[in-house]
């Protein structure tokens, strides 16, 4: 069965590249560059995985994570973040969400596509 992913990143080049790679590897991908549009489009119990950028205008990844969780508590969600911010953002999300989030649910940008595919497949299959 085809796995379905929702990809949200405010950088069109990032969404285009990741979406293309994922679709070429058998995933169905809906992608958005606007987090508000993505949330309004969101379908409960439809996605196997949501990939969120952290730093976005209008609504950051933490706020979007919280809103999606309220709507669909069981969906798997992972975050995109730049390497320079990784440690800072990882600590922040633990504080914001008040629980331990496994480091495996963070993807550092820039990412090697082979590593991305391995990580996403692993998360989906957990």
What would you call each of these model-derived segments?
Residues 9, 53, 81:
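Active-site residues of response regulator receiver
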Residues 12-30:
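Two-component/phosphorelay signaling modules centered on CheY-like receiver
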Residues 31-49:
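Acidic, metal-coordinating helix/loop segments flanking the phosphotransfer/catalytic sites
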Residues 33-34, 60-64:
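Acidic catalytic/metal-coordinating carboxylates
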Residues 40, 62-73, 95:
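Short amphipathic alpha-helix used as the core "switch/output" element in two-component signaling
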Residues 63, 84-107, 114, 118:
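Alpha4 helix (beta4-alpha4-beta5 surface) of REC/receiver domains from two-component response regulators
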């Amino acid at each position: 069965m085809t796995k379905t992913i929702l990809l949200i990143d405010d950088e069109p080049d990032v969404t285009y590249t990741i979406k293309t790679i994922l679709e070429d590897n058998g995933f169905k991908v809906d992608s958005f560059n606007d987090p508000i549009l993505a949330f309004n489009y969101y379908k409960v119990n439809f996605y196997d995985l949501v990939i969120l950028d952290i730093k976005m205008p209008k609504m950051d990844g933490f706020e979007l994570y919280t809103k999606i969780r309220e709507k669909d508590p069981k969906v798997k969600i992972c975050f995109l973040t730049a390497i320079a911010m990784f440690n800072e953002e990882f600590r922040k999300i633990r504080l914001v969400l008040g629980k331990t989030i496994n480091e495996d649910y963070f993807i550092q940008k820039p990412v090697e596509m082979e590593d991305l595919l391995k990580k996403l497949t692993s998360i989906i299959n957990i």
